[in-house]
Design a protein with these regions (language model features):
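Active-site helix-to-loop segments that bind/position phosphate- or nucleotide-bearing substrates
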Residues: 1-20, 29, 35, 87-343
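Terminal-proximal segments
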Residues: 1-72, 82
Length: 343
């Protein structure tokens, strides 16, 4: 159980939430674990198979406390809301902001700043921890290039300009990503991003990680009451969860890229986990995907201190916290959207 931003998170799959007077009671195997006064909550997000009692769901609906139900793996399932306090006002503000270049740019600026900041920190972390095994000069040059882009991002007032700066930062970052790979260079060498299809094992894992992260971000946005299909940086396209792609930008370097690098550098993955097709495409096979998912779930259970909130939580909660912060900004509770800055 974790209470953050006036949101109660039930993170264990066997937690059952019930109502007792004015309190939410968390139970496991009919044993009471904790109590939370209803009047202190704005929303409840449950990742439990056990879920919530009908009485609690009804009282939350009466009081306008949003309830989101997700699977233990983070897939959004359903939402409970009352007659008059759904997400219409929040979504109307989201749509208004998405239609306004300046409003969209204000949010996108923060997200791109977070992405470049985290990309640079990933490079600096490798320099610090493995300085004798890498080309320090190449990493330093890339780090400086990205650092010089950060104030430009904060000053940029157009979405196209932000996309250009993001592209420059990505070129600098991916230009040295191979330096961050420390083991099994024969199988896991990186010569640049290739998509649709990925042409080497590193790109196969990056693409797979991005697709999982996008799914997690879409579920987090749904749970926060936002429309994952209407973004600020990524514009509308049928079937594309544009806001999920926006939200994951700042999380790519620290959640997806570092995860892939850890799998490689810890020798978790090897050549037999991939299929090489006649077209040149390289994909994870069934065993590789199962292994990937297992370690991804382990990663999501690892702990960290959220840099903005100063609270300890699991990595898997980060997209949900960022989605809640974005919703708070759109409601006018925050002056700006605070991106996740990895430290």
């Amino acid at each position: 159980m974790k209470k953050l931003l006036n949101t109660l998170y039930a993170m264990s799959e066997d937690i059952y939430l019930s109502l007792d007077g004015e309190n939410v009671v968390a139970n496991r195997d009919k044993q009471e674990l904790a109590r939370y006064p209803l009047h202190t909550l704005q929303s409840i997000i449950s990742f439990s198979y056990a879920g919530l009692s009908p009485a609690l769901m009804g009282e939350c609906a009466n009081r306008g406390i949003g309830v989101a139900l997700c699977s233990p793996r983070g897939r959004f399932l359903a939402r409970v809301c009352g007659e008059i306090n759904g997400n219409v006002l929040l979504r109307r503000e989201q749509y208004r902001t998405a239609d306004d270049e300046a409003g969209s740019c204000r949010i996108a600026r923060c997200m791109i700043f977070g992405k470049l900041y985290n990309s640079r920190w990933s490079i600096e972390r490798t320099k610090r921890d493995h300085g004798m095994r890498v080309d320090g000069e190449a990493l330093s040059n890339a780090s400086v290039q990205i650092k010089e882009l950060l104030p430009k991002v904060l000053d940029e007032t157009s979405l196209d300009g932000l996309r250009g700066l993001e592209g420059n930062g990505a070129n600098a970052y991916f230009g040295v990503l191979d330096q961050l790979i420390l083991n099994d260079k024969g199988t896991f060498s990186f010569n640049g991003r290739s998509r649709r299809p990925p042409l080497d094992p590193v790109n196969a894992m990056l693409s797979f990680a991005y697709s999982i992260l996008a799914h997690d971000c879409a579920s987090a946005l749904e749970a926060a009451g936002l429309d994952p299909y209407v973004g600020f940086l990524h514009r509308d396209r049928p079937g594309r969860t544009s806001l999920a792609l926006d939200l994951m930008e700042e999380l790519r370097p620290c959640m997806a890229d570092r995860f892939v690098l850890t799998l490689i550098n810890n020798r978790v993955m090897d050549e037999k986990d991939f299929i090489r097709q006649e077209s040149g495409a390289v994909l994870l096979n069934d065993d590789g995907r199962r292994k990937f998912f297992k370690y991804w779930q382990d990663k999501k259970r690892e702990g960290l201190t959220h840099p903005y909130l100063g609270e300890k939580l699991q990595w898997g909660m980060v997209p949900y916290i960022q989605a809640q912060l974005l919703a708070r900004y759109l409601r006018g509770d925050l002056d700006d959207y605070p991106p996740f800055l990895w430290k």
